[in-house]
């Protein structure tokens, strides 16, 4: 765990320091969340080689700056699934690996905003532990990893409480951080005062990492349930003086009975005493949800109040489409802080602002400081994905994938089947006569919006077409049945 001294997250140049109050006062702390950015720094589709204003951190950044102008006190956190998801991510991890002395483009862009804390999602483990160690700056004490490595790092504190090193039996990274701040408040007469506060931030991720990245993690890491980790560390955080505790859960909501291996334990985690606010993710959904049929309706979920079992909560979509904002109403009694749960508020601020006269969606402008930071890497990734790899004599599409057998899935199944058949013939000849069946899923079938489909025309193929057919760096597994 760590105790970090930090100044308030504001873009203001006002250096006035009001007097400290020993009398009652009130303040608002705005917790700002990004989640599941998946390396979408730019509003750009590397699979179509085209701009796409419907997502991108460069637009979320605009919302962050606006929120910092609105609120005197902010805490900006990232909820994981940050370093994987685009061709640029794969380029920096596997094609032209980013050197130790440089930050990942995603982290470099985030540095322009000054994040206060973050946690790890399941996709942070997709490239293996040595790479994760490098991009976090070194220090992971795990078998097969150089703990002494000193690299550029991510630029903000990481906290994760429920993933442990098998080597040390200690958390992979610090389980929580406690940020010491000066917070702008008002006394009972409305006079501006400045008061000290300690903000605790604790992280949790889904135990599913041990299945999804088994080849990298087995024997090196193990997980604990989010509830068990919270019960262990929350009292410790309070004992160290945390006035407010924010839980970063890379997981969402599931109404099933609790299990330590539960993928989305938000409903159960919210019941652990000591959590004042909870930011969620992983499910690429939204909370609170103003839709007529909201995604989450389990007992304890209040979409109107933005609470989960009374805890102010948000889930800010994915790919930078929204910023989660939790307003915590704080009370100072002259000696310590408390949270007024009756006055809290949770909301999503979307980058989509509405529609124009023609019915076309409109979006907030990009933050002009972001794109120049990664321009050279952005262009390098584009050139890489343009590399020719062959041609196709049939259209490969996921249009209507939910009701048929599309060409884009057929080609993936054919490739998987041929790969496994060749492997079995060469390495497991005793099974060479067995038929090989393949199963694949349409990764792009409209979930992320109207343009979220694969549609590769007849003709030449490049790397970006192959990446469009299969988005993730998954591993092929064959099971004898």
Describe the predicted segments one by one.
Residues 11, 17-26, 39, 55-57, ...:
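Non-catalytic terminal accessory segments
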Residues 18-348, 411-419, 427:
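Acidic, metal/ion-coordinating pockets
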Residues 4-6:
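C-terminal motif of bacterial Sec signal peptides marking the signal peptidase cleavage site
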């Amino acid at each position: 765990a760590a105790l970090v001294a930090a100044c308030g997250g504001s873009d203001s140049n006002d250096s006035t320091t009001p007097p400290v109050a020993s009398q009652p006062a009130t303040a608002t702390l705005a917790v700002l969340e990004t989640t599941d950015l998946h390396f979408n720094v730019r509003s750009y589709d590397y699979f179509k080689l085209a701009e796409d204003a419907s997502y991108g951190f460069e637009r979320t950044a605009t919302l962050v700056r606006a929120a910092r102008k609105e609120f005197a006190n902010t805490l900006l956190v990232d909820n994981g699934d940050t370093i994987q998801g685009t061709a640029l991510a794969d380029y920096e991890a596997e094609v032209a690996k980013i050197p130790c002395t440089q930050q990942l483009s995603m982290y470099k862009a985030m540095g322009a905003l000054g994040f206060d804390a973050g946690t790890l999602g399941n996709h942070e483990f997709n490239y293996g532990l040595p790479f994760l160690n490098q991009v976090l700056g070194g220090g992971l004490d795990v078998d097969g990893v150089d703990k002494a490595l000193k690299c550029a790092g991510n630029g903000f504190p990481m906290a994760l409480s429920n993933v442990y090193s098998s080597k040390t039996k200690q958390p992979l990274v610090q389980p929580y951080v406690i940020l010491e701040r000066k917070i702008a408040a008002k006394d009972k007469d409305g006079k501006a005062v400045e008061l000290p506060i300690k903000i605790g931030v604790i992280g949790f991720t889904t135990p599913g990492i041990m299945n999804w990245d088994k080849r990298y993690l087995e024997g090196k890491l193990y997980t604990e349930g989010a509830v068990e980790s919270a019960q262990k560390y929350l009292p410790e955080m309070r004992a160290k003086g945390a006035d407010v505790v924010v839980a970063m859960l890379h997981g969402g909501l599931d109404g099933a009975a609790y299990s330590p291996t539960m993928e989305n334990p938000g409903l159960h985690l919210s019941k652990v005493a000591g959590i004042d606010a909870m930011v969620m993710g992983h499910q690429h959904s939204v909370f609170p949800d103003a839709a007529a049929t909201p995604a989450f309706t389990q007992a304890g979920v209040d979409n109107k109040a933005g609470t989960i079992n009374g805890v102010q909560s948000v889930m800010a979509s994915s790919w930078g489409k929204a910023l989660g904002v939790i307003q915590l109403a704080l009370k100072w009694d002259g000696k310590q802080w408390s949270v007024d749960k009756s006055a809290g508020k949770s909301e999503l601020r979307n980058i989509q602002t509405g529609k124009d006269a023609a019915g076309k969606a409109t979006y907030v402008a990009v933050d002009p400081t972001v794109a120049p930071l990664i321009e050279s890497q952005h262009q390098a990734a584009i050139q890489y994905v343009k590399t020719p790899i062959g041609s196709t004599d049939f259209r490969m599409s996921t249009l209507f994938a939910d009701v048929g057998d599309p060409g884009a899935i057929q080609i993936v199944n054919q490739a998987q089947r041929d790969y496994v058949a060749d492997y079995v013939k060469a390495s497991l000849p005793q099974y060479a006569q067995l038929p090989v069946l393949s199963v694949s899923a349409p990764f792009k079938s409209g979930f992320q919006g109207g343009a979220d489909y694969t549609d590769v025309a007849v003709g030449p193929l490049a790397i970006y077409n192959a990446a469009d057919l299969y988005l993730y760096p998954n591993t092929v597994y064959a099971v004898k049945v």
